[in-house]
Curated annotation (Swiss-Prot):
InterPro entries: PSI_Ycf4_assembly. Keywords: Chloroplast, Membrane, Photosynthesis, Plastid, Thylakoid, Transmembrane, Transmembrane helix. It is found in: Plastid, Chloroplast thylakoid membrane. The chain crosses the membrane at residues 24-46, 76-98. Its main location: plastid. The keyword Thylakoid applies. It comes from the Eukaryota. GO terms for cellular component: chloroplast thylakoid membrane; photosystem I. One of its GO terms (biological process) is photosynthesis. Belongs to the Ycf4 family. It is a multi-pass membrane protein. This is Photosystem I assembly protein Ycf4. Seems to be required for the assembly of the photosystem I complex.
Length: 203
């Protein structure tokens, strides 16, 4: 998340939910992998040999010149996983293209409202908006949870999230674990919002 606009009365954060390099990588990786599986499955169904070894190294006796997969069961299995991977890659691509879950956090002191805008799938609920009057804001809170990981060696990790505490809506998260913010960045964001909104900061 990052600030895209700031003035004395308005503060706007951009929320990049799915448009991340890692998500784009996995979408492309899944697409290429599924196409590869479908190619092998089609070749198996048509009875084609899969030539993939260069002639320079094909003289070694332990390296086959080609690989043949019978369509039942290997080819059919690869076709199933290839089709499933293709649908998954299209799904990942669509949520990246439509920026599902992304949006803006708008803090408007002049309008005396806090507005959370999130993007959904195309249709009636494409734009999801939550508005909270500023007189319902109670505080900004940093809540830290301790999680233990590992089976044989137990290691503790501390995860902090900034929340907006309201009277009617309760606690609304303003950051996420996936944002990978360090302690300094968490404290800076919480302090920045506390000063801008004129509400106390608790941790």
């Amino acid at each position: 998340m990052s600030i895209i606009f700031r003035s004395d009365d308005v503060l706007i954060y951009s929320m990049a939910e799915v448009r991340r390099t890692s998500n784009l990588f996995w979408a492309v990786f899944t697409l290429l992998g599924s196409l590869g599986l479908l190619f092998v499955a089609i070749s198996s169904y048509l009875g084609m040999d899969l030539f993939f070894i260069s002639e320079k190294i094909s003289d070694f006796s332990f390296i086959p010149d080609f690989i043949y997969f019978p369509f039942i069961p290997q080819g059919a299995t690869m076709a199933f996983y290839g089709i499933a991977g293709l649908f998954s890659s299209f799904y990942f691509g669509s949520i990246i293209f439509w920026d599902i879950g992304g949006g803006f956090d708008i803090f408007n002191k002049k309008g005396k409202k806090v507005r959370f805008v999130r993007w959904g799938f195309p249709g009636k609920n494409r734009r999801i908006i939550l508005e909270i009057p500023m007189n319902e804001l109670h505080s900004i809170r940093i809540i830290t949870e301790v999680k233990e990981e590992g089976i044989f060696t137990r290691t503790s990790t501390f995860e902090s999230i900034v929340y907006l505490e309201t009277i009617e809506q309760g606690f609304i998260p303003l950051t996420r674990i996936e944002d990978n913010l360090n302690g300094t960045q968490i404290a800076h964001k919480a302090g920045e919002l506390s000063v801008f909104l004129g509400v106390p900061l608790f941790y």
